């Protein structure tokens, strides 16, 4: 395989939000992401955004509810489809308990408190928690506590 471009991962998820601009700020404040790139459309809407967390990245885009779907596929966030999630984002953090408390204080809905998930001696153990952001995307934050 060819190497990926600098500062990119081989897989990069894109999250769609009704109010992408507000969620960019919220994701940075609550979950610790950093804004790397923001591209605005003619009307000031978020066309493309790259948020990083360590070596990881997610892209953020604005919903276009009334517009003709780009590429023939409508893109909607969970709030626009009755809260349904078709994916979760998992992020490794240094301290899952501290990260959880920071996210909770910033308004994240914690759906699973930090807990160790042990997959056996031949595998690993992680301390993880689950959170939902204000527009309904599900996130998992994990800290490796044993194993590779």
List each language-model region with its residue ranges:
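Short, surface-exposed ligand-recognition loops at beta-strand->loop->(often short) alpha-helix junctions
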Residues: 16-19
